[in-house]
Swiss-Prot record:
Family: Belongs to the DTD family.
Stated name of the protein: D-aminoacyl-tRNA deacylase
Pfam families in the cross-refs: Tyr_Deacylase (PF02580)
Domain notes: A Gly-cisPro motif from one monomer fits into the active site of the other monomer to allow specific chiral rejection of L-amino acids.
GO biological process: one example: D-amino acid catabolic process
CC per GO annotation: cytoplasm
Organism from which the protein derives: Oceanobacillus iheyensis (strain DSM 14371 / CIP 107618 / JCM 11309 / KCTC 3954 / HTE831)
Purpose: An aminoacyl-tRNA editing enzyme that deacylates mischarged D-aminoacyl-tRNAs. Also deacylates mischarged glycyl-tRNA(Ala), protecting cells against glycine mischarging by AlaRS. Acts via tRNA-based rather than protein-based catalysis; rejects L-amino acids rather than detecting D-amino acids in the active site. By recycling D-aminoacyl-tRNA to D-amino acids and free tRNA molecules, this enzyme counteracts the toxicity associated with the formation of D-aminoacyl-tRNA entities in vivo and helps enforce protein L-homochirality.
Source organism phylogeny: Bacteria, Bacillati, Bacillota, Bacilli, Bacillales
Motif (Gly-cisPro motif, important for rejection of L-amino acids): 137-138
Keyword Oxidoreductase: no
Chain's gene name: dtd
Amino acid sequence: MKVVIQRSKEASVTVDDQIIGNISSGFVVLLGITHEDTYEDIQYLVSKIPNLRVFEDENGKMNLSLKDVGGSILSVSQFTLYGDTRKGRRPNFMQAAKPSVAEDLYNKFNTSLIDEGIHVETGEFGAMMDVKLTNDGPVTLIIDSKDR
């Protein structure tokens, strides 16, 4: 699994001109899922993401986690994170998991975050979405569960 995490002051996701998820302070998490991903990858990311110390403390130092500041997550499925651009000009997405597999893992990822006490808003799996955010910092991190 690959995630792009963006610290945000506010964020929302819209489908068919309707806002279906929004958060104030927290993370926008774009989640890409590949063929080999399992529940073990979910567990790794769920233990890592809410505890990343990327929010400022009273001294302006990045010392606080999402849990520490009571932040939320806007979780958006993003198969294009597995786009391969090595050949030609059109990415191929052969490394992205099939939708039926990816949707199940995406839902388990979100449920696992909720089980950790995190408020999670989501996009709609497989839908064309408009994601808006005010990037805070900006602070943007990329984590691949295979790099542990």
